[in-house]
Every structure is written in C-alpha cells, then in structure tokens.
Amino acid sequence: MVFDLGVRKDWENLPETFVAGIKGSGCKIEVQTDVASLLQENGQSLDDVGAVIWSHWHFDHAGDPQTFPGTTDLIVGPGFKSNIIPAYPTVRDSHVNETAWEGRELIEIDFKGDKGLKIGKFDAYDFYGDGSFYLLSSPGHAVGHMSALARTTADPPSFMLLGGDIAHHCGEFRPSPYTPLPEMMSPNPLGRTLSACPGRLFLNIHPWKDPERPFFDPTTEPGWHLEAAEAKQSIDKLI
C-alpha cells in the first residue's frame, strides 16, 4: 500500500484547465521522478502494491495511479464518488483525471462501517483489520480528506502520522493545552543576550497572547480549503 503519490512527472497531462492555470500564473513545476519509479529502483515490485490511498485528490498528492498495475486499487475518502465523478475529460473544467481509476477498483472508505471506530476524536478505519494502519477522517481541506496512523512499534505502541493536508504549518496545532508555550526553556537557545525568558518572548508575539492556543488558524481565503471551519475542526481533533 502507498499513501499519496506526490506530483506526477508529466504534470502537463493533468486536466487542461488546471495546466492552463499553472502556466498562466507564472509558476514552474519540475518533477524528476515519481513514486512508482522510486519503488522499482529500490527493488519493490509494483505488482505487490495492493492499493494507492489518496489523502485527497489535489495534484500534489494524487500523482498518476496509472503508473501502477490495474491490480492496484485506488482508495478515496467519503463523498469522492458523489462530488468528483464524473471528472475530466467528461467534465472539461474538472481538475481530476478519470484515467486515475480507469481499469482498477475505486474504493471509497466508509468510516461508519464494520471497520469503523474512534481514535481520539477522529472517525477512524482499521485498514488491514489488525491495528497496523488506520485511516482518519479529517475533512475540510478537500472532499473526503483523510489522514492516517501507521504503526511503527507494537510494544510500546508508537505510530507515525501521515497528515496529508490536515494542516499546512505547525503553528496551526501548536501550542496547545497539551503542549503549551513553556515559561522557561532549558537550555536557553538565546544564551545571555536577553534578560526575558524565551517563553515570554514567544508569548509576546503570539496573536492572542495565549500560551495554550495555536499561533494560526486555517486561512479563509478562497481556494485554499473546501471548508475552512471544518478544516479547523479537524486540526482541533489532531491537537
């Protein structure tokens, strides 16, 4: 299983309205390789990859599932099929290419089904049924956005968070009531150059002067999040 594919090498084969927007903005995209190539270069057969999981459909995460064999399923989050399909080229202004799931099974995760459970405040899904990999419903940034927890050790249990785009800056989830700005830092990274303690210095530049509140909220500017308020709720669950 692979979680997200990054940007595809041949990004100019993305839907035409997206490509036109990139070129018109003056941005430049250069991609030297892709996930499928990296796996093969390191001895991993693509035939053994049972699924590609999209945290969400944006181009910098979706890659090109067609670089994997048809036996590799494409896993998407809730609401994808009803909100995204049909896609490009059936819908000319769609930014999602229908070739992504052509010739393969497209599976939409049901967080309320038999494998559904709660991890903290998140609706979760036990992907393999053995507690080794969990998908987390983290909507807001895009339709059906998902994050994941990958188990790294069994005893004591530890996990790696695969966030997708649940947040775009660590200041969106730090500090918090569980990891507040400390009153003192030891050792002091500022040495003897200032008399005030470092914690106070950071609090002075905090927008809300609150040692337990994150520095930033998700932007409400159009185009960045599908639902900024829902994105904030997902970040609050992460905290």
From Swiss-Prot:
It comes from Gibberella moniliformis (strain M3125 / FGSC 7600) (Maize ear and stalk rot fungus). Zn(2+) 2 binds at residues 60-61, 165. Disruption phenotype: Does not affect tolerance to 2-benzoxazolinone (BOA). GO terms for molecular function: hydrolase activity; metal ion binding. InterPro entries: MBL_superfamily_lactonases, Metallo-B-lactamas, RibonucZ/Hydroxyglut_hydro. The gene is MBL2. Keywords: Hydrolase, Metal-binding, Zinc. SUPFAM superfamilies: Metallo-hydrolase/oxidoreductase. This is Gamma-lactamase MBL2. CDD domains: metallo-hydrolase-like_MBL-fold. Zn(2+) 1 binds at residues 56, 58, 141, 165. It is an enzyme of class 3 (hydrolase).
